[in-house]
Amino acid sequence: MAKTPVRARKRVKKQVVDGVAHIHASFNNTIVTITDRQGNALAWATAGGSGFRGSRKSTPFAAQVAAERCAEVVKEFGLKNLEVMVKGPGPGRESTIRALNAAGFRITNITDVTPIPHNGCRPPKKRRV
């Protein structure tokens, strides 16, 4: 008995006007994730995934390229306003925000959500070069 062909349904792109850009800027890499207000990820990009390897991953330019790649994908959702949450001490903090602003998003507010311990775990020992 022949099976009837299964037709793939067209995926409906959801329209999102407001979003949140989560920027994780570590010393070695920068991760940009853009979500909707509920926290569902719409797109993400990293400096390493954008073609930068080794010490070039940890540059502000690599973070800027990652933000631009993420912004391209999210434009299809109709995103207009962004709230930015920055975490970490890395070199890509400021350049990522500038790139998102230059991509045409209206940045409503910028929040620093870097976790600061109230004397929690012992930090790693200092480097001796």
From Swiss-Prot:
Located on the platform of the 30S subunit, it bridges several disparate RNA helices of the 16S rRNA. Forms part of the Shine-Dalgarno cleft in the 70S ribosome. GO terms for molecular function: rRNA binding; structural constituent of ribosome. GO terms for biological process: translation. Part of the 30S ribosomal subunit. Interacts with proteins S7 and S18. Binds to IF-3. NCBIfam families: PRK05309.1, uS11_bact. The keyword RNA-binding applies. It comes from the Bacteria. The keyword Zinc-finger does not apply. One of its GO terms (cellular component) is ribonucleoprotein complex. InterPro entries: Ribosomal_uS11, Ribosomal_uS11_bac-type, Ribosomal_uS11_CS, Ribosomal_uS11_sf. Keywords: Ribonucleoprotein, Ribosomal protein, RNA-binding, rRNA-binding. This is Small ribosomal subunit protein uS11. It comes from Pasteurella multocida (strain Pm70). Belongs to the universal ribosomal protein uS11 family.
